[in-house]
Curated annotation (Swiss-Prot):
Family affiliation: Belongs to the XPG/RAD2 endonuclease family. FEN1 subfamily.
Cofactor(s) essential for the protein: Mg(2+)
Name of protein: Flap endonuclease 1
Positions with a binding annotation for Mg(2+) 1: 27, 80, 152, 154
Gene this chain is encoded by: fen
PROSITE patterns: XPG_1 (PS00841)
Any GO BP: DNA replication, removal of RNA primer
Region I-domain, annotated ranges: 116-258
Root EC class: hydrolase
Record keywords: DNA damage, DNA repair, DNA replication, Endonuclease, Exonuclease, Hydrolase, Magnesium, Metal-binding, Nuclease
Residues that hold Mg(2+) 2 according to the record: 173, 175, 236
PANTHER family: FLAP ENDONUCLEASE 1, FLAP ENDONUCLEASE FAMILY MEMBER
Region N-domain: start-end pairs: 1-98
Length: 340
C-alpha cells in the first residue's frame, strides 16, 4: 500500500536534468511494477514477445535508462530480498486486490468498456517468474549496477544516501523517509505526460524531491516521531492503520503526545500490532553493505541482440534508441575532454 505522507512532507518540483552527474538509488521493484502497470495496449494487455512472454518491464527499463544515461544520471537499482514477516498481511491484501481487479477486468472486456478494462488491468499487475532476472540482464547490458538488498529495497536505497554513495533514493513510496533517506525523489521513473482515467485529459507528471530534514523541521518532529505518525496512518506492516486516523489527525496526536504509548484513545488498537517491531524495521532496517558502486560501459551489441533476437523488439526502434544514447554519451565525453 505504501505510506500516505503526501500531505505532510515538503515536496519540491524539479527536473530530471537536475540529477545529472548524481547517483540515484532506485527502488527496483517499485519501478518495474510501474512499467508493468502502465506500459500496455489499448485493451489493457501488457506488451509481449513472439513467445507470449511479457516485455513491458524491459521496454520501460530500456527507454528510461537511455534517458537517464543521456542526461548524465547514474542510476543504481536496488532489488528486494526477503520481506519482513510483518509484511504478510499486506502481501495477502495485495493478492486479494488483484483477484478482485481480474474479475472487474473480465467484465469490462465483456461489456466492451476498454477504458475500464485498462484501469482494472493495471490493478492486476504482478511480478512473474523470470522478470527480475530479465531486468538484471538488461541492466548488465547497460553497464548499470544493481544491488541485492537482504530485505526491503527502499531501506538499502535509503542507507546509500547516508553513506554518501547515492544522492537520493527514488520510489513512489514514502517509506524511504522513515528508513532515514536524506532525500527521496518521486516520479523519477514515471515522469511524463499521462492520461487521466475516464477523461480525455492529460497531465504532466514531473519529478519531485523531498529533503527529509526539511520535512522534519517543517513538522517540528524527530524521525522517531514521524515513524509513529506513519504507524498511525498505516504502513506495509500494519496496513489498516488506526481507525478514523488520517495524516493530519496522526500528526496532531504525535505533536500532542510524542509517542504511541502516550495516546490514550488508541491503546486498545495498539495492543493488536507489534508496533515496537515496526519501529525497529524503520529505525534499524536490514541493509546491504555496499563496498563500491561500479558503472561499466554500455554493451550496445549485446543489448540489441537480446532485445531484437530474443525478445522480439523492433530492430529499427532499438537501434535508433541505442544510437541516440551513443551520441549523447560521446557528446558528454567530448565536452569533458575540453576541460583537460
Amino acid at each position: 500500500m505504501g505510506l500516505n505522507l503526501k500531505d505532510l512532507v515538503v515536496r519540491e518540483k524539479t527536473t530530471l536534468e537536475a540529477f545529472s552527474n548524481k547517483v540515484i538509488a532506485i527502488d527496483a521493484y517499485n519501478a518495474i511494477y510501474q512499467f508493468l502497470a502502465s506500459i500496455r495496449g489499448p485493451d489493457g494487455l501488457q506488451l509481449s514477445d513472439s513467445e507470449g512472454r511479457i516485455t513491458s518491464h524491459l521496454s520501460g527499463l530500456l527507454y528510461r535508462n537511455v534517458n537517464f544515461l543521456s542526461l548524465g544520471i547514474k542510476p543504481v537499482y536496488v532489488f528486494d530480498g526477503k520481506p519482513p514477516s510483518l509484511k504478510t498481511a499486506e502481501i495477502e491484501r495485495r493478492k486479494q486486490i488483484k483477484m478482485d481487479a481480474t474479475i472487474k477486468y473480465e467484465k469490462a472486456i465483456a461489456d466492451g468498456n476498454m477504458e475500464d478494462a485498462r484501469k482494472y488491468a493495471q490493478q492486476t499487475t504482478s511480478m512473474k517468474d523470470g522478470m527480475v532476472k530479465e531486468s538484471k540482464q538488461l541492466l548488465t547490458y547497460f553497464g548499470i549496477p544493481y544491488i541485492e538488498a537482504p530485505s526491503e529495497g527502499e531501506a538499502t536505497a535509503a542507507h546509500l544516501t547516508n553513506t554518501g554513495q547515492a544522492y537520493a533514493s527514488a520510489s513512489q513510496d514514502f517509506d524511504s523517509i522513515l528508513c532515514g533517506a536524506k532525500r527521496l525523489v518521486r516520479n523519477f521513473t514515471n515522469s511524463g505526460r499521462r492520461k487521466i482515467p475516464n477523461k480525455n485529459t492529460y497531465i504532466d507528471i514531473v519529478p519531485e524531491i523531498i529533503e527529509t530534514q526539511k520535512t522534519l523541521d517543517s513538522l517540528e518532529l524527530t524521525r522517531e516521531e514521524l515513524i509513529d505518525v506513519g504507524i498511525l496512518i498505516g504502513t506495509d506492516f500494519n496496513p489498516n492503520g488506526f481507525e478514523r486516523v488520517g495524516p493530519k489527525t496522526a500528526l496532531k496526536m504525535i505533536k500532542q503526545h510524542s509517542k504511541l504509548e502516550e495516546i490514550p484513545q488508541i491503546q486498545e488498537q495498539l495492543e493488536e500490532i507489534d508496533y515496537q517491531e515496526i519501529r525497529k524495521i524503520f529505525l534499524n532496517p536490514e541493509v546491504a553493505d555496499v563496498k563500491e558502486i561500479v558503472f561499466e560501459n554500455v554493451n550496445y551489441e549485446g543489448m540489441s541482440n537480446y532485445l531484437v533476437r530474443e525478445r522480439s523488439f523492433s530492430e529499427d526502434r532499438v537501434n535508433s534508441t541505442l544510437n541516440r544514447l551513443k551520441k549523447a554519451l560521446e557528446k558528454k565525453s567530448q565536452n569533458l575532454d575540453q576541460w583537460f
